[in-house]
Amino acid sequence: MKALIFLSSLTAIGSSILGRWLGMLDDSYAVGDAWFIGVLAGLISLLILIDSQTMTKNYIVSLSTILGILGVGFIYFPAAFINILLSITLDKQKKEDLHVR
């Protein structure tokens, strides 16, 4: 689980910075630099490491995925795919927690 979190975060941050360096992302984003939103989405996904409820972690993964795709676009898809795998893992964990109770 922690490996998926770090892989997702590093993929998001790396692809956003690489897209900026290669000139795929320019400064024409209305709010600011689009690459920064991709980096922010990668950092948000690291919040999952904080001990909290599984439902909160699912919301964080969803927010990270949506924010990354809106900010960076198609460059964020590898990280978004990893976030989807992470969300499936969290969903299984939530179901196991419900069966234990």
Swiss-Prot record:
Recorded GO CC terms: plasma membrane
Topology with respect to the bilayer: Multi-pass membrane protein
Transmembrane segments annotated in the record for this chain: 4-24, 30-50, 66-86
Gene name, Swiss-Prot/TrEMBL: yozS
Subcellular location: Cell membrane
Keywords: Cell membrane, Membrane, Transmembrane, Transmembrane helix
Domain of life: Bacteria
Protein name: Putative membrane protein YozS
Species classification: Bacteria, Bacillati, Bacillota, Bacilli, Bacillales
